């Protein structure tokens, strides 16, 4: 390690000490906890907000917020993944501060440009609810100040997740205290925007020692622009093809079908947040390992990751598919019973997205294979468009769900094709087979119960308990038989108590 400035060295020493105590599993726990918290909290607050604000004001908020978020998205460019990767590579270097400031200068400049454009849009083009639109500009300032990518690159997940969870709890409390009628929409916007604003200042406080005083180097900043733009392409492509389903459903089918799809999609997004968290945590670790030439250690982590992610993916996917007939009418009401088919179809995409997430976040991006990543996402977007065009008019929301499965499958295959000569795909795919088999046996066991079950909560709980017991038992037997490293470590730790 080169000679670091004293404050930066102090932070780095703290980081090294915490890395010894806080391993990857702990980081994953923090990130999964946050992802689940962030997904579940809106489900808790939604009934209150919808009653207090009403449908019209909620629509105004949703539209203005979405637009502001897109301006912010363009301001961030591809810094989330790119900045994370670069900080991971340089966190032991004496120029860590310079690396940060040169990347942040691009982010700040782009975000400032988007902020000015948004203010211009608000002044000259927004007629109704202009004040609300102006207040939502806080979200673009949030993008301007967002340095979570730096702390992720330093593997400081405890700080980022704890900070974000505290702020979300405070904003939720403020909403319950201050929002009482549709006339409080402005207060609601200020609370939600102010919350993320406070969160960013807390992250800056945590990072202040490592980043040091502002140091700007125009040449270095300009060198970051092209790779940031390259990694921005998949951000836009993913954003488009995740929205495409809803846009095409709204145009080619009924509003009811759109409602069914959106309801089912929220459950899938909540379930897959576990997989997303895994990739977020592992990406900086894998980047550091590969940049230091520790290829064998990196591939060891990948094998463990594939086993962990696919164990979860098959459990979630086939678990949802098995209980969907009872879950849909119990959770949403009998009018949403047909959501069971949509939920089941979307669940089939989870193993594809899980495996692709490991390949993308733990190999493609850490090794700078941005072109392969972009091609795979574009192929997914195009295939989603074609599948939706053919299927939505015939099957409605179910067609959109099948289009998502096809798109996720093609993205997964394309990413596997890109790394086929670099890693042993067969070794990783073989790890998934036992979990797939355990999932199918679980599904068969639950289906036996489903034939006699009636739509009640006790029967749903019985199905979940039986399915979970079967899957966990079979998976643990396999992991024990193969002497899985993580399981053996936990058993050894438990036996010493």
Question: What does each of the following model-derived ranges do?
Answer:
Residues 4, 105-237, 242-243, 448:
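Hydrophobic transmembrane helix module of multi-pass membrane transport proteins
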Residues 38-42, 46, 65-72, 76-84, ...:
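Short runs within selected transmembrane alpha-helices of multi-pass transporters and secretion channels
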Residues 2-9, 20-80, 172, 229-255, ...:
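Signature of the first transmembrane helix
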Residues 1-15, 444-497:
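Membrane-proximal transmembrane or re-entrant/amphipathic helices at the cytosolic face
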Residues 26-42, 167, 187-203, 207, ...:
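Transmembrane helical elements of multi-pass membrane transporters/channels
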Residues 4, 9-20, 24, 158-161, ...:
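Interhelical loop/hinge segments that connect adjacent transmembrane helices in multipass membrane
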Residues 46-47, 75-91, 264, 268-306, ...:
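Helix-loop junctions and terminal segments of transmembrane helices
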